[in-house]
């Protein structure tokens, strides 16, 4: 930029115009610079704030996956890596911890709830609750399932920020009636008999009727 300021200015204007064209003027004005690592390398593209909820329950698409990458960890819960894509939630240990998704239910009805999970066998048995507005569904994390990480799938060394994956199994929590509207879908623990609750890859909501 110092060597060719005119070229740099022209490119900056082109990027600004592209943001307005793609995101609209209001959102483009809020775009922020990418975060940098301690080594000064850029990590990701420009960050554009977006408070749109994740849609749930269209009759044409009754199954809605809510992966960890779209959720928000609270308390001691952490992502399995700094890169959200293909990550899962770990370090869920107490009743003060929780995981949330900002969703908007399109169709009032009965939804089946299935969680893709792993849990050390000695820690199985935590009582958990999924809630959305006034609706609540409780269940138990069982049986235990603690597979090893898949460490033999990379031909090249995996970048530090990417998760090593493992085989998650479905935990059928049951069914719950969700009413149309926007709200916070919350997953929390009511009792934790062991050292941890579970690791969570995804919550699946399927509109049944």
Show the residue positions of the predicted features.
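C-terminal, low-complexity/hydrophilic appendages and adjacent surface loops
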Residues: 1-2, 9
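Extracytoplasmic
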Residues: 8-209
């Amino acid at each position: 930029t110092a060597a060719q300021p005119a070229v740099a200015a022209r490119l900056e204007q082109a990027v600004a115009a592209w943001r307005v064209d793609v995101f609209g003027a209001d959102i483009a004005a809020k775009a922020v610079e990418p975060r940098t690592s301690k080594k000064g390398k850029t990590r990701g593209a420009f960050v554009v704030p977006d408070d749109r909820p994740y849609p749930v329950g269209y009759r044409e698409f009754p199954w809605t996956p809510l992966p960890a990458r779209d959720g928000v960890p609270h308390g001691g819960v952490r992502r399995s890596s700094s890169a959200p894509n293909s990550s899962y939630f770990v370090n869920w240990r107490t009743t003060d911890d929780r995981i949330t998704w900002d969703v908007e239910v399109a169709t009032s009805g009965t939804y089946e709830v299935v969680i893709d999970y792993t849990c050390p066998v000695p820690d199985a048995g935590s009582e958990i609750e999924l809630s959305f507005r006034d609706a609540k569904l409780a269940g138990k994390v069982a049986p235990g399932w603690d597979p090893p990480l898949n460490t033999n799938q990379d031909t090249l060394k995996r970048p530090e920020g990417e998760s090593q994956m493992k085989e998650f199994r479905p935990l059928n929590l049951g069914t719950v009636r969700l009413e149309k509207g926007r709200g916070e879908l919350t997953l929390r623990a009511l009792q934790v008999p062991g050292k941890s609750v579970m690791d969570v890859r995804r919550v699946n909501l399927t509109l049944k009727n």
